């Protein structure tokens, strides 16, 4: 198997003073935080990994493989994610995996899961990641129901520090949720799962509508283009609400109610007032131009209360939780001067949904709901065209669909992880319309929430397709994309024994160029042409759980470097975002849907069982006419 190793780019070794200078300046003071520099380099020696790791337990499962806790020969605990290439459905999934590896290996932050090594051979990709021993934040809050304000501030500061660092490097996460926020042995935050992340550019819009329903911003649920950071800001508002109040801010039991609440910024009235309510209101502003940015959050007085410095700088909390100098008071005064805009006129109406939607006599306190990521469509609609198209014709032929509800109840026990699918995205950057005042037309709304699946692990979440391989029948997902524009299915023969799929130059700009043209996929060095289906060397069921590394040999590679301003693909079309009101077409675009046998053929009596269908039908009409 080939391995991707994270080695520094060759060149002159910087002095100790040069290395210490950016670290002393801190993340916030540095205009562009340093990212790890890596280059693709092929090693010609093999690596046998069987004796390097001792597998201990399974942390998560996905369609592509598993995530296992393992111990290196040095004694260090790691999380090993194995991806079987024969499970990769198409090139979009492949590009999705590669993007996650490239972005996560380029980011270097204490509160972001680090990738140590990536190994690859003809049948597997093995990613060795940092191990977070205390699980995810969802389980942590589930066990405690509600955190103290001091603990909530501690977690939120670390989350903000990591997301702020990503935004300074033009990376938007787009899937911030409790399930993707892990805790290490020391109780520190580790953000995982960058499968839906992307690069963004000021002056360009992203056309990808993805994420998780209860954390999705108004732009996402209404199908409007967005720059990028504002969707993370909204998700941070939802996370802060949960950390402070211990409940979800929006009602996820009915997708119509959820869309209405998010669109109006009408979150539940908190059961108990908190000093963080002002920041929550600012983060949950419907208007993205008035929504708090990560810079605003990092300098907010509530976030920095009890700390000598703001988020990202050298932190030294004081005893008793009160600032020991005038720095916090000065920061608060500065924030009050900058935020003199009327927060109560932001359109985020704090409505009491306990009174409006609570069942009579029942408990109205909502619990947390585990979220699955939104899927991405196989092909992106042209945003420039959709912004000027008339949506009346689109909505006229879409039949209604009954509401799809999530199960009610408080926090559920953790079960085996099942990853949700995502499809890789076409280029999603589009220029801002010439007339900024012209609002984009609303897109046809479709269902948001679907049947829930098993819980996800932060190690195994967004990049994985659903267990069944269905495109439109997975749980807790938005599905968007015009079926008529979907690509024809790839020959399954392309999925067998593909070599070196992570060995391309690895530039983000290359990804968009490759996917813009119709190509097959296999090795990223040289995409293989289609070939007929060949029998696998052994059936998939014969692969043992402990055979992730087995006795195979691995080649070792370096990860690609990060290029500035690379155009990336989008992941979901605009046309199909907020609902699922029309049945998917059965054309060639629906290649990932599970085949289902026609129920008529299995019924006790069906016209398909008759020899003369026309005669039987006419006889039935005559009987009906006599009865009437």
From Swiss-Prot:
Changing residue 208 to A: Prevents phosphorylation and activation by STK11/LKB1 complex. The modification Phosphoserine is found at residues 435, 523, 544, 547, 573. The active site is at residue 175. Residues 355-493, 531-562 are annotated as: Disordered. The keyword Acetylation applies. Activated by phosphorylation on Thr-208. ATP binds at residues 59-67, 81. PROSITE patterns: PROTEIN_KINASE_ATP, PROTEIN_KINASE_DOM, PROTEIN_KINASE_ST. The modification N-acetylmethionine is found at residue 1. Residues 53-303 form the Protein kinase domain. InterPro entries: Kinase-like_dom_sf (IPR011009), Prot_kinase_dom (IPR000719), Protein_kinase_ATP_BS (IPR017441), Ser/Thr_kinase_AS (IPR008271). It is linked to Anencephaly 2: A form of anencephaly, an extreme neural tube defect resulting in the absence of brain tissues, and death in utero or perinatally. Infants are born with intact spinal cords, cerebellums, and brainstems, but lack formation of neural structures above this level. The skull is only partially formed. ANPH2 features may also include frontonasal dysplasia with midline cleft of the upper lip and alveolar ridge, bifid nose, and clinical anophthalmia. ANPH2 inheritance is autosomal recessive. This is NUAK family SNF1-like kinase 2. It comes from Homo sapiens (Human). The lineage of its organism: Eukaryota, Metazoa, Chordata, Craniata, Vertebrata. The gene is NUAK2.
């Amino acid at each position: 198997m080939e391995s991707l190793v994270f080695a520094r780019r060759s060149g002159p070794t910087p002095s100790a003073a040069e290395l210490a200078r950016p670290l002393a300046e801190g993340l916030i003071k540095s205009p562009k935080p340093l990212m790890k520099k890596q280059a693709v380099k092929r090693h010609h020696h093999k690596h046998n990994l069987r004796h390097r790791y001792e597998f201990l337990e399974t942390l998560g499962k996905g369609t592509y493989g598993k995530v296992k806790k393992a111990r290196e020969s040095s004694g260090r605990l790691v999380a090993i994610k194995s991806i079987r290439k024969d499970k990769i459905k198409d090139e979009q999934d492949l590009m999705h995996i590669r993007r996650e590896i490239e972005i996560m290996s380029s980011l270097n932050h204490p509160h972001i899961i680090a990738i140590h090594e990536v190994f690859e051979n003809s049948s597997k990709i093995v990613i060795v990641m940092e191990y977070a021993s205390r699980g995810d934040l969802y389980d942590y809050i589930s066990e405690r129901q509600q955190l103290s304000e001091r603990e909530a501030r501690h977690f939120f500061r670390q989350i903000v520090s990591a997301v702020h660092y990503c935004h300074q490097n033009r990376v938007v996460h787009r899937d911030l949720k409790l399930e993707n926020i892990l805790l290490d042995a020391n109780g520190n935050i580790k953000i995982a799962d960058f499968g839906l992340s992307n690069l963004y550019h000021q002056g360009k819009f992203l056309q990808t509508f993805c994420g998780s329903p209860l954390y999705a911003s108004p732009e996402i649920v209404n199908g409007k283009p967005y720059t990028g950071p504002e969707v993370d800001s909204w998700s941070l508002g939802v996370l802060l609400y949960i950390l402070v109040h211990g409940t979800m801010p929006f009602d996820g039991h009915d997708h119509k109610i959820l869309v209405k609440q998010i669109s109006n910024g009408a979150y539940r009235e908190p059961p108990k007032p908190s000093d963080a309510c002002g920041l929550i209101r600012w983060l949950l502003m419907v208007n993205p131009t008035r929504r708090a940015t990560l810079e605003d959050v990092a300098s907010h007085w509530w976030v920095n209360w009890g700390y000598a410095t703001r988020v990202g700088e050298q932190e030294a909390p004081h005893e008793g939780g009160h600032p020991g100098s005038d720095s916090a008071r000065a920061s608060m005064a500065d924030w009050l001067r900058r935020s003199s805009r009327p927060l109560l006129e932001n359109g985020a109406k704090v409505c009491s949904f306990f009174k409006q939607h609570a069942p009579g006599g029942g408990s109205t306190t909502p619990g947390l709901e585990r979220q699955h990521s939104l899927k991405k469509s196989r092909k992106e609609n042209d945003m420039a065209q959709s912004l000027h198209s008339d949506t009346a014709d689109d909505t006229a032929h879409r039949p209604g669909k009954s509401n799809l509800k999530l199960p009610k109840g408080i926090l559920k026990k953790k079960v085996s992880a099942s990853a949700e699918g995502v499809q890789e995205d076409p280029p999603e950057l589009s220029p801002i319309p010439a007339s900024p005042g012209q609002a984009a037309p609303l897109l046809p709304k479709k269902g948001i929430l679907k049947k829930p699946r098993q819980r996800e692990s932060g190690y195994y979440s967004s990049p994985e397709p659903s267990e069944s391989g269905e495109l439109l029948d997975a749980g807790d997902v938005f599905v968007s994309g015009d079926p008529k524009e979907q690509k024809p299915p790839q020959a399954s023969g392309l999925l067998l024994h593909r070599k070196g799929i992570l060995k391309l130059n690895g530039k983000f700009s290359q990804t968009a160029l490759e996917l813009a043209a119709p190509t097959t996929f296999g090795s990223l060095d040289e995409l293989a042409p289609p070939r007929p289906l060949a029998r696998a060397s052994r059936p998939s069921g014969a692969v043992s759980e402990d055979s992730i590394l087995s006795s195979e040999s691995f080649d070792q590679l370096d990860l690609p470097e990060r290029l500035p301003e690379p155009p990336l693909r989008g992941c979901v079309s605009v046309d199909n975002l907020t609902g699922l009101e029309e049945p998917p077409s059965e054309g060639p675009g629906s290649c990932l849907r599970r085949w289902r046998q026609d129920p008529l053929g299995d019924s006790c009596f069906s016209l398909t069982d008759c020899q003369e269908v026309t005669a039987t039908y006419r006889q039935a009409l005559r009987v009906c006419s006599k009865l009437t």
